[in-house]
């Protein structure tokens, strides 16, 4: 039963899309700067007494065609989430927009504007082409952090916490758990402010936002960049009522973060999320090695072994010195 579930999850589109990143890793090769790690939710660039954070997202073409307002909203929201997942705060976004006509982008722009207002992040420029043979949208974001939450610092014996806003519902056509578009904007911002507080207070140094790969794909990316293994306890993952676990494991929540926490800080971190009516549950443990193991109802199965198969291809960078520098900062 568990082995069959693992096989389905490995074949899910979110996991397959993450493997596409290997093409970029190979194609860009050794041009990267050792001082800027690849594989985090944002590029963290040293700047004076902190870091500039830079990230970008391209929107699914089918989402743009079928639900353009939501696509516009998500283009801002997912970038904002990337900044906060690194312990930062957003400064501004820019967009790159292609459309077949001026009329065909009105809903995209309306969704982008609504999210920019809700998250208080200005859209300050970009590129627009209304004479394209297709509609497309990508958005980039700039942020700043004093101290980082990064994907490179998970350590054996860390406790894995999943922090999720369960006050939402699934999009009717996509694996998106929407707890944002009708929520109070101030609440959205307050919920996100927990992440930079965790970084500044040094209660946490390792986090990743739950993205298109769902909880399971996010864990793979986190363990790959940290050169660790993990055990994920499926029975402890908070799941909405009447939602099958298989569907939830690959869902993309509007507010979802996976954190790797030193055991002595777990209770304090959980209290911060729970005080804002967010679910924050222990879902596993980081282990020595290269294997990610799924566990449920007394049964265990190997889900991934990085010694046999890469996910993104960013695990073999020369990161030891900078990872220590980030931890010491």
PLM feature spans:
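Beta-strand->loop->alpha-helix junctions that form or flank phosphate-binding loops
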Residues: 34-37, 129, 210, 228-240, ...
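Small-aliphatic-rich amphipathic alpha-helix that forms the alpha element of a beta-alpha
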Residues: 67-94, 107-118, 193-199, 215-221, ...
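Acidic, Ser/Thr/Pro-rich beta/coil linker or hinge segments at domain junctions
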Residues: 20, 276-329
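Active-site-proximal betaalpha loop/short-helix elements
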Residues: 100, 185-254
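Short, compositionally biased
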Residues: 172-187
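Helix N-cap motif at beta-to-alpha junctions
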Residues: 260-267
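N-terminal glycine-rich phosphate/pyrophosphate-binding loops that anchor nucleotide-derived ligands
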Residues: 1-76, 80-85, 121, 158-160, ...
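Glycine-rich anion-binding loops of enzyme active sites
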Residues: 52-54, 59-61, 89-173, 285, ...
């Amino acid at each position: 039963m568990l082995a069959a579930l693992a096989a389905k999850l490995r074949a899910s589109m979110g996991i397959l899309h993450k493997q596409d990143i290997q093409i970029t890793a190979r194609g860009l090769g050794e041009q990267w700067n050792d001082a800027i790690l690849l594989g985090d939710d944002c590029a963290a660039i040293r700047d004076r007494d902190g870091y500039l954070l830079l990230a970008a997202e391209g929107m699914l073409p089918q989402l743009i065609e079928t639900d353009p307002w939501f696509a516009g909203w998500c283009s801002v929201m997912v970038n904002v989430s990337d900044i906060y997942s690194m312990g930062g705060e957003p400064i501004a976004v820019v967009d790159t927009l292609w459309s077949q006509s001026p009329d065909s982008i009105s809903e995209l722009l309306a969704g982008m504007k609504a999210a920019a207002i809700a998250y208080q992040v200005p859209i300050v420029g970009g590129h627009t082409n209304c004479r394209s043979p297709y509609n497309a949208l990508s958005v980039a974001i700039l942020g700043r952090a004093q101290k980082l939450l990064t994907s490179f610092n998970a350590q054996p014996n860390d406790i894995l916490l999943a922090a999720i806003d369960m006050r939402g519902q699934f999009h009717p056509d996509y694996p998106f758990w929407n707890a944002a578009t009708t929520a109070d904007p101030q609440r959205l911002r307050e919920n996100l402010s927990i992440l930079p507080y965790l970084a500044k207070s040094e209660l946490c140094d390792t986090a990743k936002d739950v993205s298109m790969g769902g909880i399971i794909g996010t864990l793979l990316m986190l363990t790959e960049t940290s050169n660790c293994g993990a055990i994920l306890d499926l029975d402890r993952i908070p799941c909405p009522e009447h939602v099958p676990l298989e569907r939830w494991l690959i869902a993309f929540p509007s507010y979802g973060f996976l954190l790797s926490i030193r055991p002595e800080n777990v209770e304090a971190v959980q209290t911060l999320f729970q005080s804002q009516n967010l679910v924050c549950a222990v879902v596993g443990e980081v282990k020595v090695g290269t294997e990610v193991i799924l566990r449920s109802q007394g049964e265990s199965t190997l889900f991934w072994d990085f010694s046999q198969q890469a996910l993104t291809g960013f695990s073999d960078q020369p990161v030891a010195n900078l990872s220590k520098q980030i931890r010491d900062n």
